[in-house]
Curated annotation (Swiss-Prot):
This is Nucleus export protein BRR6. Keywords: Membrane, mRNA transport, Nucleus, Transmembrane, Transmembrane helix, Transport. The lineage of its organism: Eukaryota, Fungi, Dikarya, Ascomycota, Saccharomycotina. Required for mRNA nuclear export. Involved in the nuclear pore complex (NPC) distribution and nuclear envelope morphology. InterPro entries: Brl1/Brr6, Brl1/Brr6_dom. The gene is BRR6.
Length: 197
């Protein structure tokens, strides 16, 4: 009884290491045995897939980083505007308070001619500042976003914006189509060589 040593190839083909390069086991196709011996890293189709994956990863990373930078920029602008609004409100309150006391608007010293103004200054100086409420925050976001979009479209014409957009989409489309066509070409080439063998 003779024991034969077989090894299983990555694609499931059984190969006998004692057989020569051109010899194959019964039931195996010569093309399958040859392909099983090839290194997977030498496959042009696989290399093209990895290059395409790397290209798409780079494009996605650039797009994601630009989106994150845009959001962070707007968030910083919103925070600055909210701080500016709070400072303005504090200045108004300080002005109202100084006018209230300069004009002697305390109820027991108030002059009847200044009754309306004193009431306005009293409301103004007792106003409570709510910094960073959801309403103020949403309003500041909308205002800042509108300003950024307006500034962007004032700097660029519609033609230049469309040109940039179409160029970016075109580069991505052409590159992915080229890699896909190259893989189809390689697969067709491999199937033709199998038919001729």
């Amino acid at each position: 009884m003779e024991l034969r040593s077989f090894s299983r190839q990555p694609d499931g083909i059984l190969a006998n290491p004692r057989l020569g390069r051109e010899e194959v086991l019964e039931g195996e196709h010569p093309q399958d045995a040859r392909l099983a011996r090839q290194s997977i890293w030498l496959s042009p189709s696989l290399i093209a897939e990895y290059i395409q994956l790397f290209f798409n990863f780079i494009i996605g990373t650039i797009g994601l980083s630009l989106a994150i930078k845009f959001i962070l920029m707007i968030r910083n602008d919103v925070n600055l505007k909210l701080e500016h609004n709070v400072r303005e409100e504090l200045d108004k309150i300080a002005t109202c308070k100084s006018r209230y006391f300069e004009n002697q608007c305390e109820p027991h010293m108030r002059v009847p001619a200044l009754e309306v103004r004193c009431n306005e200054w009293s409301k103004c100086m007792n106003k409570e500042i709510v910094s960073g409420s959801d309403y103020q925050w949403a309003k500041a976001w909308a205002r800042t976003l509108a300003e950024v979009i307006n500034a962007f479209f004032e700097a660029f014409s519609i033609r230049s914006f469309l040109f940039i957009l179409i160029s970016i989409i075109g580069i991505i489309f052409v590159t992915n189509t080229s890699f896909g066509s190259y893989r189809v070409y390689l697969n067709n080439k491999d199937t033709k060589s199998v038919r001729h063998a």
